[in-house]
Regions:
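Flexible "arm" and connector segments at domain edges
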Residues: 1-98
């Protein structure tokens, strides 16, 4: 991505934040998280081969990527007061220590 792409992306995110309520954005995030959980479950089923899905591995991976991007988009549109980088850093450090 170049600087122009980031500027356009930021403008689109601002548009969503101004025109879609916080409640609606949180509802969207919860729906996307549920779809992500289903996509991860199908991916795990395919990896384990215990209860495989009829979809191909490529389809499953593409679906997982799409759900990840849906969540990322929702997170990009979360209100600034919900973002706390101290918590982020603490969680990241804990993960590294494991």
């Amino acid at each position: 991505m170049n600087d122009k792409d980031f500027t356009e992306k930021d403008a689109k995110i601002r548009y969503v934040c101004v025109n879609v309520s916080s409640l609606s954005r949180l509802i969207q995030l919860s729906e996307e998280c549920a779809e992500y959980i289903q996509a991860v479950s199908k991916c795990l089923r395919t990896m384990s081969q215990d209860n495989p899905t009829p979809k191909s591995e490529k389809e499953i991976i593409e679906n997982l990527k799409e759900e990840i991007m849906n969540i990322q988009l929702c997170l990009d549109c979360i209100d600034a007061d919900m973002i706390d980088y101290k918590i982020y850093e603490r969680k990241l450090n804990r993960w590294v220590r494991r």
